[in-house]
């Protein structure tokens, strides 16, 4: 999910190798030599291994402070930054307008269909889909200017680690929780630019199939994973367009990170995922929920929610209970439901992201006033940085989290009717 806030220190290090995005169309890429391409792939794979967090000998596989975090500077991170910058610079006025207009969907909620129809007409789902495509075609590049290229702020799993390193720790915990092993096939819902999928394959040896609504991100995911030498697959697909294009019992596991607030009907989606998972397979979500302390009748709570939903790109407002109920209705057995962040808070990481992007915004606005940058940079960054501290406040008040974890399992044998 796109988290429209910011990151710690500028583009200095990258946990998984460089970003070979096709969309930026930077000329001069040298793919003419098979030997050089093989060398590039070997370098990429080595870079992934080298930049994973390392554990001290004998350390537990927990989210304590036992990890030695790799904070080394990487020139590949600068390449990602520059490519994203170029893409944003070259946006057309129509692309900017469509992105800004897409925020209208975050003032609504899937649960209020009458309001959706009143705003968008009976084909509101198609309108929401178009808005999401316009939103993600820009937000993924904005996020790539900071530490949220993967478009999510992770749970706080190590207080000493950076946002990116906490992402890696989160992804590795997912792989362990759902039992990923070489030869397994796993579905990644809302795969983004394929960076999480690449780390999952590097860490576990499993093969990932990713789906995403944004063709731009899918193209980047393809190229990135191919250059890593991974056989992962990525397809353009709206998660609300069911059934999914997969055979019954064709996957060994499923995970998603902060994509379900875009889901119109979680119950229908979970039933579809149940269909395509093999018996005994694990299902894991890490996602946005409102927590029991949130009271929609409280004016302060409601005001904060109206500010935060557009910031994090949330259409729906699910709860842990609603997700658990939908999973059980689909046939899953829920085995875990918790918040993996230390002390249940990710506010420290959110604040780091927000501080970084607000710092970038100040520089952007200065350059725009001097006519050194197109004026749409200011428009985009003013929107991106809006209400980051409201997000921090809601997390500290334990009203919401974007990192709630639920693990479920498809039974080995279907229950008797």
Give residue ranges: language-model regions.
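N-terminal auxiliary segments of SAM/dcSAM-dependent transferases
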Residues: 61-145
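Class I SAM-dependent transferase core
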Residues: 117-120, 124, 130-179
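Conserved class I S-adenosyl-L-methionine
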Residues: 183-190
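Conserved SAM-binding loop of SAM-dependent methyltransferases across substrates and taxa
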Residues: 193-204
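Conserved SAM-binding strand-loop segment of SAM-dependent methyltransferases
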Residues: 228-242
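A short acidic, Gly/Pro-enriched loop at the edge of an enzyme's catalytic core
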Residues: 242-254
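A short glycine-rich, Lys/Arg-flanked "PGG" loop and its adjoining helix->strand segment in the class I
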Residues: 267-282
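Substrate-binding/catalytic lobe of Class I Rossmann-like enzymes that use SAM or dcSAM, i.e.
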Residues: 297-298, 303-403, 411-412
